[in-house]
């Protein structure tokens, strides 16, 4: 607001710093003139981004979103980090309301896109499930208008329908059954969809099958996403970077099928799912009912949303304990350690369940 504050020739006075950042990133992207693949969806964005970028890196000089810098600030920063040596950009796009993907697409101007899935995430901001479909579909809208191409899992009727609704949109449909020899270190059957997307993208862009298998097989998840860890006392399935009803349900279905492999019991540590608005109570009750279907499992619920939902149930599952916070559960675990258990740890990142790992 004060021109006198500009005291260095490297400083530029602008009316809107955020708008200037976004416009600068857009212009930089245009000058690079490279293919850019945008990835969005309710679940699996970051994992798919990591897999896809590793596969493409077997043939191209790739720059991909670091961490989860996937919003109106993170996407411009990602684009500006690309250099003249970059041959391919992979950009993750997150959103919690309609209009946000449209903005990000107008900045990154992707040529290709992947929607991993349409699930029940950020229901409050999107205004419900239909809003999620409409908001995430903004990526398809952009690509349909600009002559782009999407990669669509052939077994997903929602995404297939969304692609078909846009008559000018070119679509590359791919199977979600993994080809022989493709192995990965991701926990959960649901992750095969992310792997299948990476395989499809690699093949489309001419990456040799052997290099695809190597790239997928060498990727090991971190940051508490789909990690299986054997401690001195227990086996942990850590998936607590984020949680919404769709990802929570997928984790529970997978956990029910997990063999004990030397453990004597199963324990679920489930943290609140956030940003669900009016749908919160019903979604948390549904997750509790799914958890109760896992035979002989001990259920530990963390946070006020799960507590409210649990107390509203007419029939409450046995062997369930409520904890107001991660800190209270941590204190309990210090007093009464658990051992020889297969433990699922799943919840929204802000609940802080990853801090329990050292106690398990």
Per-range role (PLM):
Residues 19-150, 154, 160-166, 331-335, ...:
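Phosphate-binding loop of NTP-binding sites
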Residues 92, 191, 235-244:
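Active-site-proximal beta-strand elements of phosphoester/diester hydrolases
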Residues 2, 8, 240, 265-270, ...:
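C-terminal helical cap/extension that packs against the catalytic core
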Residues 39, 56, 223-225, 350, ...:
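ATP-dependent carboxylate/acyl-activation modules
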Residues 9-19:
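N-terminal pre-Walker A segment at the start of P-loop NTPase domains
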Residues 222-224, 240-250:
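Glycine-rich phosphate/pyrophosphate-binding beta-alpha loops
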Residues 2-9, 112-235, 257, 263-264, ...:
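Acidic, Mg2+-coordinating active-site environments of NTP-dependent enzymes
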